[in-house]
Structure formats: C-alpha cells, structure tokens
Amino acid sequence: MTTVIKNGTVYQNGHLIKADVLIDGQKIKAIGTDLEGEEIIDASGMIVSPGLVDVHVHYRDPGQTYKEDIKTGSQAAARGGFTTVGAMPNVTPVPNTAELMDKMVRENQKKGLVHILQYGPVTNDETTDIIPDYAALKKAGAFALSNDGHGVQSAQTMYLAMQKAKENNLIIAAHAQDDSLFNKGIVNEGIAAEKLDLPPVTELAETTQIARDLLLAQKTGVHYHICHVSTKTSVELVRLAKARGIKVTCEVAPHHILLTDSDIPEDNAYFKMNPPLRSKEDQVALLVGLLDGTIDLIATDHAPHAKAEKQGGMRGAAFGITGSETAFSTLYTRFVKEEKVFTLEQLLSLLTDKPATVFGIENAGLLAPGENADIAIFDIEHQREIKEDDFKSKGVNTPFTGHKVYGETVMTFVDGKVVYQRGTK
C-alpha cells in the first residue's frame, strides 16, 4: 500500500521545503510535488520531519516496570515524535552478558513501537570495576556503552574500559560524576540550595570527571560521549578538547537549557534531576555551545518514576524527569517561536540527523528515497497545555505540567506504519 503525505513543509538535508512524501510499504519511495498514493494524508500547515532520534532514555524494563516498561516508554516516544531511541542499561538485571543482551534486544524488538537501540554497561553492574566482554555484548546487539546514573569512579577502570571500547569500536557514553564531590547533594550549589536549605551539588562533581576522561580519551583514541552536560566549565572543556583533536561528543538535555535553579519555586521533587538545574550563566553557555557546535545534540534523559517516588519533597525523592512527550514542543515554543534562539531547521537537526550521525545510526534521522519511512508530523500552529492525563508514559514527573506549548505531534510513522496519531488513546 502506498501513502502520500501532501502539502506539508518537509525537513530534508538541513532545509525546509514544500513537498509531498510518498511511502511505499516500509520505505520512502519519493519526495517531490504532485505525488499520488492510495492513501492521502493532508499535512497542510504542518512540519514533516524525519522521526526524531533520542539517544538517552530509561525504560526501567526489566526490574522496575512499575515506573515504565518497553511498551509505555515507546508509546511515549512515538507521541513525542521519536522513532529511534537509545535505552540505558540501568535495569535489573543489567545486560552485562551476551545472553542477557540478546534477550533485551529481542524484547525491545518484540514490545517496542519504535526502534530501540540497547546500551551495554561500561562495568558489570554499573558500580563495580569489573569490565564485561564488550565483544560479546556488541555481537549480541549492544550499540554503545554507558553506566548512566553512575560515574566510573576509578580512573584505572575507565582507562581500561576505554581501551577495550576502542578495540571493539564502541562509544562510551559517560555520566560524568565524581561521587566524593557530589557528596549526596540534591540541587545546584547556589540559589536553590540556599533558598531551600538543601544539600548542594558542586559543578566540580561533573567537571573534574570530564577533565579526567578527556585525558584518557586522548590517550586511548576512544569515541567518548558525555551525557547531559550541564555547566559552563563542561562546555569549555569540550570546546578545548575538540580543538585539540580529541574524539569527544556531548549532549544536553532539554531541561538544562529550558530551566535554571532559580526556576525552582519550592521544595518540589519534579524539579529534582541529576545533573541538577544549574545557574543562568550555565544555561547561556549551554545554548552558545549548541549554536557553535561544541554540544553536538539534544537528548531527553527520559527518566520516569512512580508518583510515590516524587512526593514529600526533594530529600527522599528519586532523581529524574520524563522527557519524551515534552521535548520537541517545549524546545520549539521557547527557542524557535518565542525567543528565536534557533531556527526550526537547527532544532530539527539537533534532534534528527546530528544524533544519528554522532552514534552512526543507519536509516535514522533523514528523509530520502529508499530510507526507512520513519516520519513525524508536527502541528506548529496549535497550542496545547501539557497535562498529566495526556501522557502515554507511566511517569508524569515533569516540571512542565501546565505549560502552554506549540509543536504537537500529529502523527508518527515507524517503518511506514502509524504508531501514534493525535486524538487516539
């Protein structure tokens, strides 16, 4: 069966063009004008984009499915316009053997509505210094390595891990955190910590480990990717490392450029995430880093939790917020429509072709004849209010509830199949 998406504005190769998109089965057959198909979808006034790519999600499956599972996580991704995601390995059990990795890959394929790429762990259970068999993990389907949620505390362990990752052509995506400096902190050292009388998190917990790892990456030649950079100094370190030819890339999460620690209104656990919300100076540096290419891409760090884990203030609450269903609309509304920090083309690139390129993900992040029909259609004129009742995710832990935004997902295709349509349950 053929389907033609007509009259939309298509994001292709860095440009927005008026065109139709013809889908034949699982593939894009043509992009052009006056195309015909058996089924017609009118996208007048809408943006037709490659499916968004999110290299940083937490699906909690197996082991913590009361928070999220593969089905609900991928439903949330589809509602947000994401068609390819990278799932972190902080599940129970951690997929640290070929057998466990193979099982996870098969479960992702079986239950997921979108393409789910599975991370393997840097160390066996993300906290030990035991390095698993990377070759076996890669053969079983691991697309990259991460201990996200934990920094690798031992420099020697990270050095050995980088050497082995380099041998196996695997990216290490690091959660940069020195636990001795993090010191059980909750919010950024500064305005929020003082106002709320909460334990502070110094930026040094992030920056010192980035500095260490950049030296190790320079020595080993590994592709070192930094998850959710959040400070001005982190951006400066990456900028310097890139200038020196170190193979480093990094991402920023939407909340770190949309919010600062001064936006935390009270002791509200929906504002508790790791890294924490930083200062206005840090926020500006992150935006500059995105604009000049120091920061390569945007990734959500979608981290759903049960409501009970986000009640009673920050001290006893879990770290993390959801992001799949709010990312595009909040970013578009603030930085394209209102403040004009980015063009729409720049924002779409940071969410499509750039993450696909950084991680070498084939058949993702672009619209072209012969490519997979992974497509998102966005209504950038319709305003909606972010409401908990609308979420597909089990987690509703977001500080953006009640915000009025533009850029709603109208329809999402994966391999030519509609996996989300606005107005359907």
Curated annotation (Swiss-Prot):
It comes from Lactobacillus johnsonii (strain CNCM I-12250 / La1 / NCC 533). This is Dihydroorotase. The lineage of its organism: Bacteria, Bacillati, Bacillota, Bacilli, Lactobacillales. One of its GO terms (cellular component) is cytoplasm. Belongs to the metallo-dependent hydrolases superfamily. DHOase family. Class I DHOase subfamily. The active site is at residue 301. Substrate binds at residues 58-60, 90, 274, 305, 319-320. It catalyses: (S)-dihydroorotate + H2O = N-carbamoyl-L-aspartate + H(+). The keyword ATP-binding does not apply. Its EC number is 3.5.2.3.
